Amino acid sequence: MGEDRRSLRVDYDDNFLRNNICSLKVSFIKQQGGAEGVKRLYADLGLALVALIWGSTFPVVKIALDSMSPFAFNTVRFFIACLFFLPFLKGWDFKDGFKIGIASFLGYTFQTVGLDYTTATNAGFITSTYVVLAPIISWLVYKDVFDKRDVSGVLLAFVGFYFLSGYSGFNIGDILMLFCALFFGAEIAMISHYSRLSNPTMLAFWQSFAIFILSAPFAVFTTTKFEINTTVILCLLITAFFATFVAKMLQNWLQSYTKSSDAAVILSLEGVFAHLFSVAVLAEILTPVQYFGAFLILLAVIIVSLRV
């Protein structure tokens, strides 16, 4: 009899626990606006992970450049990334992806070379201005809808750039990063245009292939250092697998579940994560004026993304 009571008690506790968990799940789903809201929440969290991965690569690439020249690094990085994409290819239509890859190649070239001349923190924040520049480029090239507030975002971003650079004259690294942001803005505008017609994974592969094939000739003639060691191999794997293959696959998949404005704001956290990783790994510190500049850049990105 005692055993029966204990058994009933256990069954009651189990049912009570299951019912409470179910109630919590239902309550959570309602709070998030239904099943679609939950999907959007998970998508936003996933995109935050993408921003974290991208932000972490700035100090990683800067470390790798101590042992390998910029074009050589990009050649090897994107060759490895292409290998990861191969199992997911569906056809060989390269036209649109290769076009985007040309803009990507120029963006990564300016970014990687620029990291030799500026801090990883500056590189991260200045690169994030591609969110501000993309709508302007879309309007100029594809005649997309233009919002006048995009202009205020650009102006605010340039003021932030001025303060982030120390307002005593721009260094070559920061200027190269600005060109990097310009071409990444073009890349985003082109992806928005062509992804309506093409498979996102195919676009990502051909982007990577274009960067690899265009970087290789420059690597042959400009490489002054090419040291393969454990640190460089680790940096290559982090940037090729996590920052290129995993991040691109996640981005292409998750952006279909959330609003583009939300995605842009979340991905702009790349600059914040770049700073946090740079402080932790490279012990980089900004002055109060530079922090103000970084804040203005982040604010500009939010204004353009949310149209506030």
UniProtKB/Swiss-Prot annotation:
This is Uncharacterized transporter AF_0788. It comes from Archaeoglobus fulgidus (strain ATCC 49558 / DSM 4304 / JCM 9628 / NBRC 100126 / VC-16). Keywords: Cell membrane, Membrane, Repeat, Transmembrane, Transmembrane helix, Transport. The chain crosses the membrane at residues 45-65, 69-89, 100-120, 122-142, 151-171, 172-192, 201-221, 226-246, 263-283, 285-305. It is a multi-pass membrane protein. It is found in: Cell membrane. Belongs to the EamA transporter family. It holds the Pfam family EamA. Residues 52-166, 178-306 form the EamA domain. InterPro entries: Diverse_Substrate_Transporter, EamA_dom. One of its GO terms (cellular component) is plasma membrane. Signal peptide: none annotated.
